[in-house]
Swiss-Prot record:
Name assigned to this protein: Protein pthb1 homolog
Lineage per the UniProt record: Eukaryota, Metazoa, Ecdysozoa, Nematoda, Chromadorea
Positions with biased composition (Acidic residues): 734-744
Region: Disordered, residue numbers: 722-744
UniProt entry keywords in alphabetical sequence: Cilium biogenesis/degradation, Protein transport, Transport
Function: Component of the BBSome complex. The BBSome complex is thought to function as a coat complex required for sorting of specific membrane proteins to the primary cilia. The BBSome complex is required for ciliogenesis but is dispensable for centriolar satellite function. Required for proper BBSome complex assembly and its ciliary localization. Required for cilia biogenesis and both the assembly and movement of intraflagellar transport proteins along the ciliary axoneme.
The organism's place on the tree of life at top rank: Eukaryota
BP GO annotations: cilium assembly; protein transport
GO cellular component terms listed in the entry, alphabetical order: BBSome; ciliary basal body; cilium; membrane
Key word tRNA processing present: no
UniProt cross-references to InterPro entries, sorted A to Z: PHTB1_N_dom, PTHB1, PTHB1_hp_dom, PTHB1_pf_dom, WD40_repeat_dom_sf
Amino acid sequence: MSLFRLVEWVSQTIPNTSTILNASFFQDREQLVIGGENGQITISDPGFRDTNAHVLCTTETKYAILQMASDNFLPSMNNILAVLSPTKLTYYKVHFASPDETLASLDEIFSHSFSTSAWNMCVIPIEESTPQILVQSIDCKLSLFQGDQCVFSMVPLRALQPGPIGYCQTTQTLFVANNGFLAAIKFSLMSSGSQKKINYDWSFNLGDTAIQMKVTEGSKPTTIVLCRRHVSAFNATGSVVWQIRLEAVGMAMCLYRSLLINNTQFNRLIVSTSDDTLLIFQDNKLVWNCNAQMSPVALLVCSYNKSYENTITMMAPDGKVVVGYLGTEPNLYRLPEDKVIVNYAERMEEYKRMEQKIKESDAAGGAIKRKEGIQMKLSIGEIGKRTIEPNAASNAPYCNLIVEFSEVQNVSKLHINILSECASPSKQVILNVGTSKSTASIEIPFYVGSKKSPTSNKVTIAAHCAFTQLTVTKSIDLPFKVLFEESQIDRNAKYKVTIDTAGSVMPLNKLFSEFESENPQAIGFSLHGSDKTVSVFAANKSNRYRIQSEHISLLQITSRELVKRIAESAPGIEIGGVIPFEYMRETLDEIQELQTKKKEDSKKIDCRTKEVRAIEALSLNSCKTGNMGNLPSLDALFDKSYRELLDAMDSYNSLTAKIENQKASLNSLFQLAADLSKLSKVDTILNGSFWANTQQSLRDRLRWAVKTDRGNEMTMIEKLCEHSPKELPKIREEEEEEEQQVTA
């Protein structure tokens, strides 16, 4: 950021401002014309002798204003104001209502209407005639107007996205920067008004989105294009003259002439960037920069009176218009004078005293307390019987999660991200906080979705403040009843998990008291909106609980809920379980088999795609040569190949969905293994999320887990084997000769 700043002379804020223009309507000095999105046109006179904020006139139109231009567009009439709107091009004349020229009015002369919305325009100067206006529509078609006549209309360009346009009178060339390409067109080609697409003389790939274009006249005309990340200059033949790389995003650009140096060899330009900086260049040489204290989207260099010539006029996105000039005094600090004498002995004593205070403060625990930042609390709110959200399962209940924030002073907005397998109206929420409030809260409903069945009831909330760059994250488990409802038990389910306890089993109808079951030894649950069921059984003789289901993904969430309820009902009881490694191996085998089939389908898709393209090429060649006899055979072959291609793509998508479901089941088994290991007081890194949110293969993740989650015993053995050439104690190692004798 520059140390120098722009000194403000005149400023005013007009809401919904879209464009600004400097034009001379009287007294051989310039006035400022401001156009708005609401159709308002304001003509102000900053160089007025009494007040700088003097407004000549304000006119309301019915259309949003895109661009304005001022010139002698009509014969025998000077300084006509041309206003471009999405549907009209309107000409206005300025009439003064008072003899002292302090008040004026805008009178509409005539207008041209468009059938397609306009995008921008440029002025085409004509020797010994009135200037013309070239308008580009939103679909990249050009229309030329001269006064009240339309020369031609809707001439198409070879582009889809409109961009800046400019005209060079010296070479009579039109420049367009559409689709990220700068192209040159001879203006004489468009004089016929043909509806055929026009060929370019030359084109250049800018590699970025063009924002603004300026064209300079003279013996060496130059086209200067401002893009988001660079400024490029081109000569008449399309060669790059120079280029400037911007450190921030470019916002606006304007050219100007120096009042003291009359040298047309160089181009002088001002570029504004998104980091509130104005860059003043002489061609590609940076001669000055300053802090604009705003990010201008429009720039002008105007002379409003003889006292303030070549002042800079800027327009901000919020409608603030500032007229100022470059300051030469740094606004951050001033360098000390060279005559200041520093007493180094006193400075050293001062540093020693400060160091002693810091040591005493550290010994006492520190005098500076760490700022806690934003505090977040999660709690379960109302549980409703049925939600009306469109993405919810049929007859699914909802649960409101209350998110409470505290210590949010000076925080205006919080970005909340939601991570949960349960559905909600939105995964991203923006919470607006009042500036005078220190607390805020929001309720977010959760329910079972209609597209994806959840395998976990865990909800993670992350709140981020863009201003302070602070982020807080909390997690909570949704109630079990939000996901499941009571159903019939299934004793013949394929997948089982056993939970052992040191004490007698507890009645299941008491553990799950919110359900209406009266059976103390068996209870069944089904996921809302689906036929997925899970059953829980209690065995009094063996003091065990058994969980059975046809869906692996339901074992983990049910076992976790069961263990939590047992621990709450009987504190201190020992609980354990057997990790189902055979289910993991079975799921891994199925994933590998599906991935093999997916690779075969991918090869088949590539083969059929090449075959379809070859048939299309043969068909086009036959049409060009006129050999139409083999078209029925090619049509039949194309139909067969295309159907096989569609079948292979359907199979590929189906296998991809199956692989994702199997991966979700495997992640659930990993979390189940982590939960059962934790019951035995063994923490492991292999949980349900260590592979879920990565793009790595399972083999790579397991390698990382083995290196990361190793016990001290394995580390000791590894170090001993790598660095100890001695024999291990208490282990008899026989020599090779003795082994050979025993073998003989």
